[in-house]
């Protein structure tokens, strides 16, 4: 299963990947908006959107891509791992 994590804290990016790996998932983590963001997202099985730490522009792009390619988006307010 492939997961895209959007938002969160820069320092927690490797922790997010470790958690996904422990559940047998391959993860991409985007804490900031890179160039060609739409292409880098790809078509994952799930997108996790940390709403408290993500920019409006990134959230809109993820939602548009999810609607187009029909993958679910889990919206979580907190970016904590507890």
Predicted regions and their residues:
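Short, charged N-terminal beta->alpha structural module
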Residues: 1-24
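Cofactor-binding loop segments of dinucleotide-utilizing enzymes, especially the Rossmann-like FAD-
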Residues: 6-8, 32, 78
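A short acidic, amphipathic alpha-helical/loop segment
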Residues: 16-19, 39-40, 61-62
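A short, well-structured beta->alpha microelement
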Residues: 23-40
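An anion/phosphate-binding loop that grips the pyrophosphate of nucleotide cofactors and donors
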Residues: 44
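Short glycine-/small-residue-rich Rossmann-like dinucleotide-binding loops
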Residues: 52-53
């Amino acid at each position: 299963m492939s997961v895209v994590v959007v938002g969160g804290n820069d320092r927690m990016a490797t922790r997010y990947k470790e958690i996904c790996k422990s559940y047998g998932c391959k993860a991409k983590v985007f804490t900031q908006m890179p160039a060609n963001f739409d292409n880098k997202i790809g078509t994952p099985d799930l997108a996790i959107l940390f709403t408290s730490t993500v920019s409006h522009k990134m959230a809109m792009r993820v939602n548009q891509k999810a609607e187009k390619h029909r993958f679910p988006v889990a919206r979580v307010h907190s970016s904590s791992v507890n």
